[in-house]
Design a protein with these regions (language model features):
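N-terminal export and membrane-targeting signals
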Residues: 22-51, 309
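A catalytic-pocket lid/entrance helix-loop region that shapes and gates access to the active site
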Residues: 208, 234-248, 324-386, 433-442
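Conserved acidic catalytic loop of the alpha/beta-hydrolase fold
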Residues: 293-306
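Alpha/beta-hydrolase fold nucleophile elbow
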Residues: 305-314
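Active-site loop->helix "elbow" adjoining a glycine-rich segment at hydrolase catalytic centers
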Residues: 314-319, 327
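Catalytic-loop region of hydrolases
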Residues: 29-32, 43-47, 59-261, 384-387
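Alpha/beta-hydrolase fold active-site neighborhood
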Residues: 385-508
Length: 508
C-alpha cells in the first residue's frame, strides 16, 4: 500500500481504511480525532485480531482500530506512519539456530533470533539492558504453561537515578517454536490488570478464537505500575478490606454522589490514606499514562522485540496512542478496541460518553413504546423527561431492594439502567422488566438483579483478593485521570458545565 500514511502526530487527522470480513478495502476516509470514534462490539475484537496476520501479509502495520458502524460487517483500520513495515525498518528474523533467550528463560522467546536494534533513551541504559528471567508462575491456570517475570523501571523517568519500582509480567508462550514476537495486552481502566486479563482469556488463545495469535506470538499481560503484582498503591487498611468483605462497609465507586465540597473533602481523606499505607507513596505522582507507556518500551526491549505489538481495550487504546506518539519508530502491530479519542480532554470524553448513552437510551425507548408493561408513555422526549424526573427523586426516596439489599439512590439506579441499555438490544426486555417494577412499585430489586447478571457485580466483591483488586482499580483510575488531565476552570465554569449536562443528558 505505498503512499498511504497517517500524520506522525496523534492530534492530527488520520487516514482510515474500511475493510470487509475478507480484509478487502471497500472504502477510505479521513477522520479528525476531534470526532470521537464509536466503540466496537466484542465480535469485532475476534475479527480484528485477524488483522495482525492480514496486515503483516500486506507489509503494513496496524496502529489503531475502531469500528464506526458502516454497512455490513466492516471495520476501520488505521495504518501507521510507515507505509511498508518491511521496507522502513530492519526485518525480524526467526529460526531455530539462534536464540536470545538463555536456558533459564531470560530474554526473548525460545527459538527467536529477534534483535531490538532500537535506540536506548539516554540515562536508561541499565533498565533497557537488565536481565529478564521467565519462571513458571506459582498460580498457573490448569491446562496452560504461564511464565512470569518482573521488570525494574524508574519511579520517575525524569530522574532515573532515583527510586525504582517493579512491573509484573505474565506470558502465555506461543505454540510456535519460532514465534514472530510478543503481543502485550492492556484491559483498560485505567486500573485494569493485564495479568487478570490473560488469566481470563487463556482459553481463547489456547483453543478459541484467538488461537491464531498464539500460533505466531507470545502473549503477555502486565500489571501497570500501581496495580496488582506490580509495585502497588494501597489506600486502605486491612480493617477496611475486612469491613467490605463482611458487608459492614461499601466498596468505593468511580462515581460519587454529593456536592463538589463533599467530593473534594473525600478526595483529601483518601489521598492521606494513600500516603499512609502505600509502600512507595511517591508512586501516586507517577501513575500517568506516559510513564506506563515508557514502562512498555522497556518491556519491549527486554523481550528482544524491535517493535511493540499491542492489543488495548478502552483506556488501553489511549495508552497505545500515547506509546505511538512517544516511540513512533518502535511501533509494530497495534490493535485498539473501543477506541478513545486521544485528542479529547477528560471533560470532552465524559460528555461524549453521556451523549452516546443518552442516544442509546432514546433508541431503547423507541423500540419499547407501545409494548405491554413498558412504563414510559408519550413521545420519546416525554419518556426521557419522565425517567429523569423519576431518577431525580431517588436521592430523597431510594428504591427498596428485597433480601437485605441496599436501597438504590439516583447514582446506583442510573448505573443499573446504563448497564442494561448499552449491553445489547437483546437485554432490553430485562431493562423494561426492571423499570416497570421500579416505577410502578418503587422496588429496585429486579432492576439491580438484572444489571448484576450482566456486569457480574453485586454486593460485596467477595474475597479479600477480589476486594483489593477492586480498590486498586478505583484508586488507580483516580490517580491516573488526575495526572493525565489536571483540573482546569473554576467553580463557576463547573457549575455552568453541570447545568448544560443536566439539560442535554438528563438521565446519564
Amino acid at each position: 500500500m505505498p503512499g498511504l500514511a497517517t500524520p506522525t502526530s496523534i492530534n492530527q487527522s488520520s487516514v482510515w481504511f474500511i475493510f470487509d470480513e475478507d480484509m478487502r478495502i471497500v472504502a477510505m476516509r479521513r477522520l479528525r480525532t476531534s470526532s470521537p470514534p464509536q466503540t466496537t462490539s466484542r465480535l469485532t475484537v475476534l475479527t480484528l485480531l485477524g488483522a495482525l496476520t492480514a496486515c503483516s501479509m500486506l507489509g503494513a502495520s496496524v496502529t489503531a482500530v475502531a469500528s464506526p458502524p458502516t454497512q455490513g460487517a466492516q471495520h476501520a483500520v488505521v495504518l501507521d506512519n510507515s507505509t511498508n513495515a518491511s521496507s522502513t525498518r530492519p526485518s525480524q528474523t526467526t529460526g531455530s539456530n539462534s536464540s536470545n533467550g538463555s536456558s533459564n528463560g531470560s530474554g526473548g522467546s525460545k527459538g527467536s533470533s529477534r534483535s531490538t536494534g532500537a535506540k536506548v533513551p539516554k540515562g536508561l541504559e541499565s533498565f533497557y539492558r537488565q536481565d529478564l528471567t521467565w519462571t513458571d508462575c506459582p498460580d498457573g491456570v490448569t491446562g496452560t504453561a504461564f511464565q512470569c517475570a518482573t521488570v525494574t523501571v524508574p519511579l520517575d523517568y525524569d530522574h532515573p537515578q532515583g527510586k525504582t519500582i517493579t512491573v509484573a509480567l505474565k506470558k502465555l508462550p506461543s505454540t510456535s517454536s519460532s514465534p514472530r514476537g510478543s503481543v502485550f495486552l492492556n484491559p483498560g481502566g485505567p486500573g485494569g490488570s493485564g495479568i487478570s486479563l490473560i488469566n481470563a482469556q487463556a482459553g481463547l488463545y489456547k483453543s478459541g478464537g484467538l488461537s491464531g495469535v498464539l500460533a505466531n506470538y507470545d502473549v503477555i499481560g502486565f500489571d501497570p505500575r500501581g496495580i496488582g503484582q506490580s509495585t502497588p498503591i494501597t489506600c486502605w487498611s486491612p480493617d477496611d478490606v475486612q469491613a467490605i468483605v463482611a458487608g459492614r462497609a461499601e466498596a468505593p465507586s468511580q462515581l460519587t454522589p454529593g456536592s463538589a465540597t463533599d467530593i473534594v473533602a473525600k478526595g483529601s481523606r483518601e489521598a492521606a490514606a494513600c500516603q499512609k499505607y502505600t509502600e512507595v507513596p511517591e508512586i501516586l505522582d507517577h501513575m500517568d499514562t506516559r510513564s506506563v507507556a515508557r514502562d512498555m518500551d522497556v518491556m519491549r526491549a527486554l523481550v528482544k522485540d524491535q517493535d511493540l505489538n499491542f492489543f488495548g481495550y478502552s483506556y488501553g487504546t489511549y495508552l497505545g496512542a500515547v506509546y505511538t506518539e512517544l516511540f513512533p519508530d518502535n511501533v509494530g502491530r497495534v490493535v485498539l478496541d473501543s477506541a478513545m479519542d486521544p485528542a479529547l480532554s477528560r471533560q470532552e470524553a465524559f460528555e461524549g460518553d453521556a451523549a452516546a448513552w443518552e442516544q442509546t437510551l432514546r433508541t431503547y425507548i423507541e423500540s419499547q413504546q407501545g409494548k405491554a408493561g413498558f412504563p414510559l408513555s408519550g413521545t420519546t422526549d416525554e419518556a426521557v423527561s419522565r425517567l429523569a424526573t423519576f431518577l431525580d427523586g431517588l436521592d430523597a426516596h431510594p428504591l427498596t431492594v428485597s433480601d437485605g439489599g441496599k436501597p438504590l439512590d439516583r447514582t446506583k439506579a442510573s448505573m443499573a439502567i446504563r448497564t442494561l441499555v448499552v449491553a445489547s438490544p437483546d437485554n432490553w426486555p430485562l431493562l423494561t422488566e426492571g423499570l416497570a417494577q421500579a416505577m410502578n412499585a418503587h422496588d429496585g430489586t429486579t432492576l439491580m438483579r438484572n444489571a448484576e447478571s450482566l456486569s457480574g457485580g453485586g454486593g460485596s466483591p467477595g474475597t479479600e483478593e477480589q476486594t483489593v483488586e477492586l480498590l486498586q482499580s478505583v484508586y488507580a483510575f483516580s490517580a491516573n485521570r488526575c495526572l493525565d488531565f489536571p483540573d482546569t476552570g473554576n467553580q463557576a465554569s463547573w457549575d455552568a458545565a453541570l447545568a448544560s449536562y443536566r439539560r442535554d443528558y438528563p438521565v446519564f
